[in-house]
Design a protein with these regions (language model features):
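Conserved non-catalytic scaffold segment of RNase H-like nuclease domains
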Residues: 86-196, 210-232
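Helix-rich "cap/lid" substructures immediately adjacent to catalytic or cofactor-binding pockets
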Residues: 495, 508-552
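Ser/Thr-glycine-rich phosphate-binding loops at phosphate-binding pockets of nucleotides
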Residues: 1, 26-33, 95-100, 406, ...
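Substrate-recognition/cap helix-loop segment adjacent to the acidic, metal-dependent catalytic center
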Residues: 180-197, 338, 342, 347-349, ...
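Mg2+-dependent phosphoryl-transfer active-site scaffold
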Residues: 4, 8-24, 31-40, 250-498, ...
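Catalytic DNA-binding helix-loop module of base-excision-repair DNA glycosylases/AP lyases
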Residues: 542-545, 556-568
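Short alpha-helix plus adjacent loop in nuclease-associated cores
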Residues: 70-74, 140, 188, 198-219, ...
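N-terminal accessory regions of nucleic-acid-interacting proteins
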Residues: 41, 45-88
């Protein structure tokens, strides 16, 4: 499903089917992308695990590759150069033909202009009797009909005259490969060998004028102010091409290029020209780890440098990164197949074949559509078989293995309906004529190739496919090791920052609880190699604060005292306590303080320092460190930060300052067809079919709702586009290459943006590379604006302000009545997260008194099925209050420890509940834990 709106089967289903059939391997080759690799790998890992549990070994290999869009940038502007200067003689010619194939189609007109010393000196023009009727489409295009060529000379009569006209001259044509292939083919049939220098004005124009949007003859004539009188008439096209060529000769002299040899030396295509080349399909397989990296380099280049409707890969780049790669000739859209259909010369075909490591043929049904094409000489299935026979002959002649492949786009024959729907949605008129691009069995493939003879059929279906498989090592699509970024002295840096800040807050002698908690955290963080993550977050937050914007810490990072002391979060996770800002008196353990265990220190009553008389600070939110880094402190921290949406882009840019240019990438995402979109595709398809039937007097197509839903289900999750995580930044350690992990690209292939994302969905590589969550949020922006408007520092606003808390119960503090604001009873309408009907109903049900109540309400509002029919009911029945109900996962661990349960057991219960293991009945320890909770007086409603 990762071939863009083309493939419709999950890679996991294809792999499982191949294994059931006893196949030894399967190659994953999506169009232009490699985004199915990680799913394929995870499928294999799961299957190998399942086999291992049964004491069996799964002998199956994934071959990782791509069906690339290959462009040939290796063609030289001048073929067979012999040092001719541009003052020599040139014959600029053009042909009109009955079709595109030099092998079977005929020449109907030859037009030529001789150029010497940059001046037109002679002309040659003649019709040619093709001895067959001129197809109607050719007559429409050229306005040449059978009457006009009836009495013209035949090709065997006129071609020698034309070649005599060209003798000693360099031949020039627009898209010379087409015209010269006809000349060479027809000359060979009458025993004449054509060995001349040839210049292609398309390639020459691409070199001299790389920024044109295309290089059609009429485009060039307009650009160079050349007259083109009757386009698609040989004599007029040749004259126009000659005028263009003369102007381009002057441009060559201006560049100090006086002859054809120097033209070939200088005339290399730039990126713009390469992007405009016609693409061919080509299979590229990675045979080993080096090949995988080189494959990713090619995929990245195709998306970043050469994308033009398709991610194109130049041949020269393939040659540069060829180590570890196996190159196949692909399908009917491949370069070799096209050259055979178009009747290219033997020399050209030999050049093409020699580029590939193996050649491909496919079932006749795959290419049956060619029989219906007016512009293709293929008339029947035997013509298609002959093309495959020719490829087999070329394989034998050049020593290239020929492999029979089935070009799988869907798993089973009946699955074509999904692709039909998708193709129709893209506007293809022939969507209903689906080729049999399903996964074939070995027997089916042998039957498809039986016209080759049983021995040769077995060779291409079995022997050679296994030969390719044996050339490929078992590899993983992503380097398996963890590669965190490195910041020099990050361990000591974090320790110093935290200890200095702790002393600033708690005084020269730290309370024992602070020392023990901080030391435990720092030891866990540093010993597990996580200090760099804290330092990165610290640098980003401090930079934002210095620039005037607060940063909100999301989620469980607030449970880390090290994060508090590093300035990453203002949330203090210690148990509630009093602290004197002047003399550092503290109170963690008085009965008055213990009463607020599991709550928030800011909810405690105001108090004066018994030592110096200063007002005590009320601190601590009682969040266990285990919720962040696990019970043993070895869980990887997930530091999510909310930056101002106005500042987010600057924070992203600052990561490049921290790590260096080219070391950070936006986290990539893959957009697929959603359920409703798929349903819309199916509905539209059948509506349009019914409308067409109505015009043709046929009955409408009626599909039951369940059938529409079934078909829509098969269209879900097909790749549609790519994008970027709103705040995710992937960090590559210095000294590493991104292609060890993933290719890269622009989001949605937008070539106008400088943003570069990972090609793989970021979830596929988040175990290998660090992803920073630098999110944009409105709240820090609003706080900054309010600070500017009022002059009040938001960090100095007391969290126990009675007036502020009253907003969650009535409107009196605002100086207005409910009837003034449409009957709204609360003053929370403008407070983020609390202004919805659902949230305000929660407020009215729970009647929050304290700041900790608001935290609990936020937990209930964002959980799944924890309020409606759950906590709400318990509160209404009087079994619980907002203070005693389970509102966050931390509540479970803290409460169970308070009830006397072992801390590790309390942690495990919390995690099993959080992960849904208890609710789904998948927690085998639950009966034992439940009894333990009962024994410790935990009420039934809580359990």
């Amino acid at each position: 499903k990762m071939s863009d709106m083309d493939g419709v089967s999950y890679v996991s289903d294809i792999i499982k089917q191949a294994i059931r059939w006893g196949h030894k391997a399967i190659a994953i080759t999506d169009h232009g992308v490699v985004q199915a690799f990680t799913d394929a790998f995870h499928t294999m890992s799961d299957l190998k695990g399942s086999y291992a549990k049964k004491g069996e070994k799964l002998d199956f290999k994934i071959i990782y590759g791509v069906e690339a869009y290959l462009v040939d940038d290796t063609k030289q502007i001048v073929t067979n150069p012999r040092g001719q200067s541009f003052n020599d003689t040139y014959v600029v010619f053009d042909l009109e033909t009955t079709g595109f194939s030099a092998e079977v189609d005929r020449i109907i007109e030859i037009g030529a202009v001789k150029v010497c010393n940059g001046e037109i000196v002679d002309r040659f023009s003649t019709f040619v009797n093709p001895e067959i009727p001129i197809p109607f489409r050719i007559e429409t295009l050229t306005h040449i009909n059978d009457q006009m060529v009836m009495n013209a000379p035949k090709i065997e009569e006129i071609l020698p005259e034309f070649l005599e006209f060209c003798e000693g001259a360099v031949m020039v044509a627009h898209n010379a490969e087409f015209d010269t292939s006809f000349i060479i083919n027809k000359a060979e049939k009458i025993g004449i060998n054509v060995d001349t220098t040839i210049i292609d004005t398309v390639l020459l124009a691409q070199f001299l004028m790389p920024n044109l949007h295309n290089y059609k003859l009429d485009t060039l004539t307009k650009h160079l102010n050349v007259v083109l009188e009757s386009h698609h008439r040989a004599v007029d096209d040749a004259a126009a091409t000659a005028d263009i060529f003369v102007k381009m000769i002057k441009m060559l002299y201006d560049r100090d290029i006086p002859d054809v040899d120097k033209l070939n030396e200088e005339g290399k295509m730039d990126e713009n020209a390469i992007k405009k080349l016609h693409q061919y399909h080509c299979i590229i397989l990675a045979s080993n780890e080096m090949g995988r990296i080189n494959l990713y380099r090619l995929v990245s280049a195709s998306h970043l440098q050469y994308f033009n409707r398709f991610p194109k890969i130049p041949k020269s780049l393939v040659n540069q990164y060829r180590e570890g790669l196996i190159i196949g000739s692909a399908c009917e859209a491949g370069e070799l197949f096209r050259s055979l259909v178009n009747g290219r010369s033997e020399a050209e075909i030999a050049r093409i074949v020699n580029f590939y490591d193996y050649l491909e043929i496919q079932p006749i049904g795959n290419n049956r559509f060619m029989i219906e094409k007016e512009d293709c000489y293929v008339q029947n299935e035997e013509d298609l078989r002959n093309l495959n026979r020719r490829i087999v002959e070329l394989g034998d002649k050049f020593g290239k293995p020929v492999v029979a492949t089935c070009d799988v786009h869907f798993l089973n024959p009946e699955d074509e309906v999904y692709r039909r729907i998708i193709m129709a949605g893209k506007g293809f008129d022939d969507a209903d004529n689906q080729a049999p691009l399903y996964l074939h069995t070995t027997e089916e493939m042998l039957h498809e190739c039986d016209y080759l003879g049983s021995d040769k059929a077995y060779e291409v279906v079995v022997t050679n496919t296994n030969k390719i498989m044996d050339m490929c090592e078992e590899i993983e699509p992503v380097r398996p090791d963890k590669c965190p970024p490195f910041i020099e002295n990050s361990d000591q840096m974090l320790r110093t920052i935290c200890e200095n800040r702790a002393h600033e807050i708690y005084g020269p002698e730290l309370p024992q609880i602070v020392t023990e908690r901080l030391e435990r955290e720092l030891n866990s963080i540093i010993s597990n190699g996580y200090s760099v993550m804290y330092i990165i977050a610290q640098k980003l937050v401090w930079k934002s604060n210095d620039d005037g914007y607060l940063v909100g810490s999301r989620g469980s990072v607030g449970s880390s005292l090290a994060a508090t002391m590093a300035g990453i979060t203002e949330v203090n996770p210690l148990i509630p306590h009093y602290l004197c800002p002047k003399c550092y008196y503290n109170d963690f353990y008085s009965d008055e303080v213990k009463a607020f265990a599991g709550g928030a220190g800011c909810d405690m009553p105001d108090k004066i320092c018994p030592k110096c008389g200063a007002k005590l600070n009320k601190m601590g939110f009682d969040i266990p460190f285990e919720t962040f880094l696990g019970f043993k402190g070895n869980k990887e921290p997930d530091i999510d930060l909310n930056f101002s949406n106005e500042y987010q882009s600057k924070a992203h840019a600052y990561t490049e300052v921290i790590f260096g240019k080219g070391q950070t990438f936006k986290a990539g995402t893959i957009g697929t067809v959603a359920e409703k979109t798929a349903y819309g595709f199916v509905m539209k398809y059948f509506e349009e079919k019914s409308a067409k039937n109505a015009l043709e007097g046929k009955p409408p197509i009626v599909k039951r709702k369940c059938e529409i839903e079934r078909i829509a289900e098969g269209c879900i999750d097909i790749r549609r586009t790519t994008g970027q995580h709103p705040g995710g930044i992937v960090v590559l350690p210095i000294g590493e290459e991104i292609h060890s992990f993933t290719p890269v690209q622009h989001p949605a292939n937008d070539m106008t943006t400088s943003i570069v994302t990972t090609h793989f969905d970021y979830h596929s590589i988040d175990h290998n590379l660090l992803k920073l969550d630098i999110l944009g949020h409105l709240d820090p922006t609003m706080i900054r604006m309010l600070q500017d408007l009022t002059g009040i520092d938001p960090l100095e606003i007391p969290l126990d302000s009675k007036e502020v808390m009253s907003l969650f119960q009535n409107t009196s503090a605002l100086g207005i009545k409910p009837e003034d604001i449409g009957g709204t009873k609360l003053g929370a309408l403008g407070i983020p997260e609390f202004g919805t009907d659902f949230a305000m109903q929660m407020l009215m049900d729970t009647k929050p008194q304290y700041f900790s109540d608001l935290v609990r309400i936020a937990g209930l509002a964002h959980g799944t099925d924890v309020w409606l029919g759950n906590a709400q009911t318990l509160i209404k029945e009087g079994k619980a209050t907002i203070s005693t109900a389970i509102c966050t996962r931390d509540d479970i661990m803290i409460y169970l420890i308070q009830k006397g349960l072992d801390s590790e057991e309390s942690f495990k219960i919390m995690e099993m509940v959080r992960k849904g293991k208890v609710a789904s009945g998948k927690c085998k320890e639950w009966p034992e834990w439940k009894q333990d909770m009962i024994d410790h007086g935990v009420p039934d409603w809580y359990i």
